[in-house]
A protein has these predicted regions:
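Secretory-pathway-linked proteins and extracytosolic
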Residues: 1-75, 202, 209-211, 215-230
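Alpha-helix capping and helix-loop boundary segments enriched in small/acidic/polar residues
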Residues: 31, 48, 73, 85-92, ...
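Short, solvent-exposed loop/turn segments at the edges of secondary structure
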Residues: 35, 129-133, 191
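Short, conserved phosphate-binding/catalytic loop or strand-edge motifs used
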Residues: 37-38, 73-82, 118-120
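Active-site-proximal cofactor/substrate-binding loop regions of enzyme domains
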Residues: 54-56, 62, 68, 81-92, ...
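Hydrophobic/aromatic-rich core segments of domains that either
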Residues: 95-185
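Long, His/Glu/Asp-enriched segments that create or flank divalent metal/ion-associated functional microenvironments
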Residues: 179, 183, 188-197
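Conserved small/polar residues in nucleotide/adenosyl-binding loops
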Residues: 235-237
């Protein structure tokens, strides 16, 4: 254990939220791009509900914008790179992946904004700069904001990783926001069931299949294991 000292000249979280919103809008981080608009139109074609559209856009970004931590030098920080750079390079860190999703959502007609969070740690009540991760929020038809994290959901079915429960985040929205927190998800929402169907042949050989059924974090963990091992086996082939 060690003491932790937090200091800030920002009076309240709403002030930081408004600043984060303004710095990215002024820079033009989410300006539309014709080539990207074509991709968005292609992805949402035939999708009827807002959740269908949000899901297909989130998963395309998660699966196609590769995580690559390359420093761009002076000027890095809370300003998200613009749509043209992200869509052209198809790689970047969390803020680039989140920024691409925000741009895609806006081109699909949604209100979407960036949000700051601290992956794996608690955010204290003092409105200081203690964030290490960038995510997105989208405004639903009922007026509420839904957090999305494309960095943590490649090749899985979730839109916000279940590993990020009770995680604080601060949206950069035009009306300003207080510090938010993701809800707890009950253990029964993350089940894994294994069904074995085996038969013993006359010659003593055991043959059969195992069927795995899983949801949320259990499902994501298994998909990650399978995907990682598949790529490793390809590298050694």
């Amino acid at each position: 254990a060690a003491p932790k000292l937090m200091m800030s000249s920002t009076p309240q979280w709403k002030d930081k939220s408004l600043w984060f919103y303004k710095v990215n809008e002024d820079y033009g981080s989410f300006a539309p791009l014709p080539e990207a608009q074509k991709k968005v139109d292609e992805l949402i074609k035939g999708k009827k509900t807002e959740m269908e559209k949000i899901a297909v856009l989130t998963h395309w970004v998660a699966d196609n914008i590769r995580y690559s931590g390359i420093s761009m030098g002076k000027g890095e920080g809370f300003t998200l790179h613009n749509t043209q750079m992200n869509y052209t390079d198809r790689c970047g860190v969390c803020k680039d992946i989140a920024g691409t999703l925000i741009s895609f959502l806006r081109m699909a007609g949604f209100e979407a904004y960036p949000a700051m969070t601290m992956a794996g740690s608690r955010v204290e009540s003092i409105p200081a700069d203690h964030f290490n991760h960038c995510v997105a929020v989208v405004k639903l038809s009922n007026g509420t904001y839904m957090p999305l994290d494309p960095t943590w959901v490649p090749f899985c079915r979730e839109l916000w990783s279940s590993a990020e429960q009770q995680q604080n985040y601060l949206p950069g929205v035009p009306e300003g926001s207080d510090l938010c927190i993701t809800p707890v998800s009950a253990p029964e929402n993350h089940y894994m069931r294994i069904k074995a169907d085996n038969r013993l042949d006359a010659n003593g050989t055991l043959r059969g299949t195992f069927t795995l059924t899983a949801e949320r974090q259990s499902d994501s963990n298994k998909r990650r294991i399978i995907n990682t091992r598949f790529h490793r086996s390809e590298e050694h082939t």
